[in-house]
From Swiss-Prot:
Organism domain of life: Bacteria
Listed Gene3D superfamilies: Ribosomal protein L33
One Gene Ontology cellular component annotation held by this UniProt entry: cytosolic large ribosomal subunit
Keywords (A to Z) from UniProt: Ribonucleoprotein, Ribosomal protein
Similarity section: Belongs to the bacterial ribosomal protein bL33 family.
InterPro entries assigned to the protein according to its UniProt record, in alphabetical order: Ribosomal_bL33, Ribosomal_bL33_sf, Ribosomal_zn-bd
One GO BP annotation of this record: translation
Organism: Rhodopseudomonas palustris (strain BisB18)
Protein name, per record: Large ribosomal subunit protein bL33
Gene that specifies this protein: rpmG
Gene Ontology MF term list: structural constituent of ribosome
Length: 55
């Protein structure tokens, strides 16, 4: 079997609320860390979410 191209990652809130999203990422085309601006319901505002590994 071939190695999977898409991997699951965890996008953790930079507001230190502990909230996170799970997203997919193409590891061949996106080699750098993913950063997205999304809504954090705990902080009740839009903040940056940074990539971390799923344990």
């Amino acid at each position: 079997m071939a190695k999977a191209v898409t991997i699951k990652i965890k996008l953790v809130s930079t507001a230190d609320t502990g909230f996170y999203y799970v997203a997919k990422k193409n590891s061949r085309t996106m080699t750098d860390k993913m950063v997205k601006k999304k809504y954090d319901p705990v902080a009740r505002k839009h903040v940056e979410f940074k990539e971390s590994k799923i344990k």
